[in-house]
Regions:
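Transmembrane signal-anchor hairpin modules in multi-pass inner-membrane enzymes, especially those
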Residues: 1-88, 112-122, 173-185, 226, ...
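Alpha-helical transmembrane segments of multi-pass inner-membrane proteins
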Residues: 20-24, 74-77, 102, 115-144, ...
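Hydrophobic core segments of transmembrane alpha-helices in multi-pass, intramembrane catalytic enzymes
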Residues: 34-45, 91-104, 157-173, 206-217, ...
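Transmembrane alpha-helices of multi-pass inner-membrane enzymes
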Residues: 40-46, 333, 355-369, 373-413, ...
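Membrane-interface catalytic loops of GT-C/OST-like multi-pass glycosylation enzymes that act
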Residues: 87-92, 146, 153-156, 201-206, ...
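Long extracytoplasmic/lumenal interhelical loops at the membrane interface
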Residues: 145-146, 259-273, 277, 281, ...
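A membrane-periplasm/extracellular boundary helix in multi-pass inner-membrane enzymes
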Residues: 196, 200, 221-263, 273-281, ...
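Hydrophobic transmembrane alpha-helices and their immediate junctions
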Residues: 219, 226-228, 322-365
Length: 423
């Protein structure tokens, strides 16, 4: 495998990679440190762009993914302009949809050396594994009144959503021979840590999501190796047996379909009914981007006890805040990512496309049915980070000839070491 050519300012690129890695490692530990690292990364990116703006080149595949997200961003503009507080909506638009996306842009534009990409992913898997293991410490020491592990961040569902991305990635890295040894070593720890985290976090939504995405991500590898299939089945049955032998887990599983006495489920349904009324009142552009909290009290049912801060559903929340226009943009964006990644994987079997598919399916579509994952800052940054790294790793293999081009661009049409494009 060869390294993707990158701009001549090699030290700046190295510092940029370090800043991004540091940002991802402290993302759920210190907001201040994360924002500082992000600011430094953006500054380095601007310097690199200014010095190399005439020679920067992206693959057609990455451009297409970026354009699809751009369509979604455009669909949000009407809900900003017609909001009862356009300034607040504009601020929310930048913070929620632009600033969190920056990490994707920085990686796909500037981090083109496979060594850096592998190091970034290795560091991310290692830190997240430690956080997942920390949930066991929380449980054993009764650190939370609800008896659940939240990791380094107080948001329980946030960690649950992240693990829905983490487990498929780690398992595929372990099973696919393309990945480097040190990445596989971190993946071993990551699989173990995530399984512990899933048990200690006790997110029912995460359990159900993993039942969908893990088989999809690992199917081709398990089909080829019966020993591997038996090992995975043994681990699954062992975990299932442990859960069924524990009254607290049995109760947790049984509560999945309880929509009456389980307030978590019942309040979500009431909030969704409120959203239905919101959409009826403002069907085209919604109540305004980022204006849910201000408007929800007018629509909230008295029976809803938790005073939810969002709709706990990606599609319903976007429909309420951004109307049919915003929902259509979201469906196009997600549909494009799912269709393109699955189509590319079927054409040329590789770990990168199937992981892009399962990450988007699991985090946004499935876990996003019970939580507003699009609004979770650390979760979305991790999603964009993972997608960018995976797509860039795929590019390194495309340029080495191991994966045929999905875009029709030949290897002769890529930048050389100086950043110049040769055709």
């Amino acid at each position: 495998m060869i390294d993707l050519p990158y701009p001549e300012d090699r030290k700046l690129v190295k510092y940029l990679a370090f800043s991004i890695g540091f940002m991802m490692c402290v993302l759920r530990i210190s907001t201040a440190a994360m924002q500082m690292a992000c600011g430094i990364a953006v500054l380095l990116g601007l310097i690199l762009w200014h010095k190399n703006r005439d020679t920067i080149a992206l693959s057609e595949e990455i451009k297409a993914y970026m354009k699809a997200y751009g369509v979604f961003l455009l669909s949000l503009i009407p809900s900003i302009l017609l909001s009862d507080s356009p300034a607040t909506s504009l601020k929310g638009f930048f913070n929620e949809w632009i600033w969190r996306y920056v990490v994707f842009i920085l990686i796909v534009v500037f981090i083109k050396r496979r060594e850096y990409l592998v190091n970034l992913l290795t560091a991310y898997l290692t830190v997240m594994s430690v956080e997942c293991m920390f949930t066991l410490v929380e449980i054993m020491n009764h650190m939370r009144p609800d008896g659940r592990g939240a990791g380094f961040n107080r948001m329980v569902l946030s960690l649950g959503g992240i693990m829905c991305m983490l487990l498929p990635v780690a398992m595929v890295i372990l099973m696919d021979s393309r990945f480097e040894k040190k990445l596989k070593q971190s993946a071993v720890f990551s699989v173990a840590g995530t399984l512990v985290g899933l048990l200690c976090n006790k997110s029912r939504g995460a359990w159900l999501t993993e039942l969908f995405v893990v088989p999809i991500a690992t199917f081709q590898y398990l089909k080829q190796n019966k020993k591997r299939m038996l090992a995975v089945a043994a681990v699954f049955l062992g975990i299932l047996g442990f859960m069924l032998s524990s009254p607290q887990y049995v109760q947790r599983i049984e509560s999945i379909t309880n929509t009456t006495t389980d307030r978590s489920n019942a309040d979500r349904i009431l909030a969704w009914k409120s959203a239905e009324i919101m959409v009826r009142d403002r069907p085209v552009t919604g109540i305004g981007l980022g204006r849910f909290r201000e408007h929800y009290q007018k629509y909230r049912f008295k029976e809803e006890k938790q005073d939810l801060g969002h709709m706990h559903n990606n599609f319903i929340h976007i429909a309420a805040e951004n109307g049919i226009v915003g929902l259509a943009g979201l469906l196009y964006f997600i549909g494009f990512y799912l269709y393109t990644s699955l189509r590319n994987h079927r054409k040329n079997k590789n770990p990168y496309d199937i992981l892009v598919f399962t990450i988007c399916l699991g985090y946004i579509c499935i876990f996003g049915q019970i939580d507003y994952t699009l609004g979770v800052s650390d979760g979305m940054r991790m999603l964009w980070f993972l997608l960018a790294v995976l797509l860039q790793l795929k590019e390194t293999e495309r340029l080495s000839g191991e994966i045929p081009s999905a875009s029709g661009i030949s290897v002769a049409e890529i930048p050389d070491g100086s950043g110049l494009v040769h055709r």
